[in-house]
């Protein structure tokens, strides 16, 4: 039974206008982004995360690589966690994320991290809270619900109760 879910936004990517941001593979992590990922790994040390589900984009897979290496975690790449595609309705992102959350809940793991992007993280928070979460105090660059390598912790307290907290922001 899933007890803890960590929603991790990718680290800061390289800013290169010639690389489309919202289509696969997108930009790679910058050196700063790699440092953010290392800080996130440090934060997660001792939190007993058992598995990473990861968007296949360059910036998310490189963030996950740092986490997996430092924490010794297995990784599952899934398009369900990928970036909000150009022209993709947000409801479609929510459907994808709903399927991803179902897979996480059906997995044998109790503590899972998902390395994704701002829009799917917003969709996950809305899904898991039945749209009751107030994200108005959590608006970061690009309108995202977390800064780069920010981590939301969702605790599953019982079948109906969940606690949400933005627990980590890199320095």
What residue ranges belong to the model's regions?
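Short, solvent-exposed aromatic-acidic interface loops
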Residues: 164-171
């Amino acid at each position: 039974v899933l007890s803890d879910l960590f929603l991790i936004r990718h680290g800061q990517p390289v800013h290169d206008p010639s690389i489309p941001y919202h289509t696969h593979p997108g930009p790679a992590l910058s050196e700063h982004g790699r440092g953010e990922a290392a800080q996130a790994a440090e934060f997660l040390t001792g939190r007993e995360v058992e598995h990473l589900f990861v968007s296949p984009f360059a910036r998310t897979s490189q963030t996950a690589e740092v986490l997996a290496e430092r924490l010794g975690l297995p990784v599952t790449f899934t398009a369900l966690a990928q970036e909000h595609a150009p022209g993709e309705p947000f409801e479609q992102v929510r459907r994808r994320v709903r399927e991803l959350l179902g897979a996480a809940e059906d997995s044998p793991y109790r503590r899972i991290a998902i390395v994704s992007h701002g829009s799917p993280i917003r969709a996950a928070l809305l899904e898991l809270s039945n749209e009751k979460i107030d994200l108005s105090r959590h608006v970061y660059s690009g309108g995202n619900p977390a800064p780069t390598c920010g981590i939301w912790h969702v605790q599953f307290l019982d079948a109906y109760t969940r606690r949400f907290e933005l627990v980590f922001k890199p320095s």
